[in-house]
């Protein structure tokens, strides 16, 4: 009798899609209110002046202006310099 032994099932072959995290607007780029600046897990970057933080730690602009990255007290902050000041 021609029988074929049952094939084993593989335990590999699956992976999750990338989460598209990272910096979306870099230093000195122009932003408008609501623009996402950084998507992150945890607070690698902290919100500075004129920057808000969502419940998933996403940083976003609160005013129109230019993005600025800076380090204060050993932490990395993202701030938005308002257009009036950025023009000066």
UniProtKB/Swiss-Prot annotation:
Residues 1-23 are annotated as: Disordered. One of its GO terms (biological process) is translation. GO terms for molecular function: structural constituent of ribosome. SUPFAM superfamilies: Ribosomal L27 protein-like (SSF110324). It holds the Pfam family Ribosomal_L27. It comes from the Bacteria. Keywords: Ribonucleoprotein, Ribosomal protein. One of its GO terms (cellular component) is cytosolic large ribosomal subunit. InterPro entries: Ribosomal_bL27, Ribosomal_bL27_CS. Transmembrane segments: none annotated. HAMAP family: Ribosomal_bL27. Belongs to the bacterial ribosomal protein bL27 family. NCBIfam families: L27. This is Large ribosomal subunit protein bL27. It comes from Methylorubrum extorquens (strain PA1).
């Amino acid at each position: 009798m021609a029988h074929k032994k049952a094939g084993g099932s593989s335990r590999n072959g699956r992976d999750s899609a990338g989460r598209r995290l990272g910096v979306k607007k870099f230093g000195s780029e122009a932003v408008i209110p609501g623009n996402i600046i950084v998507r992150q897990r945890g607070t690698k970057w902290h919100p500075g002046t004129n920057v808000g933080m969502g419940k998933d730690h996403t940083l976003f602009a609160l005013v129109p202006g230019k993005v600025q990255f800076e380090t204060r007290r050993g932490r990395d902050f993202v701030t938005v310099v308002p257009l009036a000041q950025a023009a000066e």
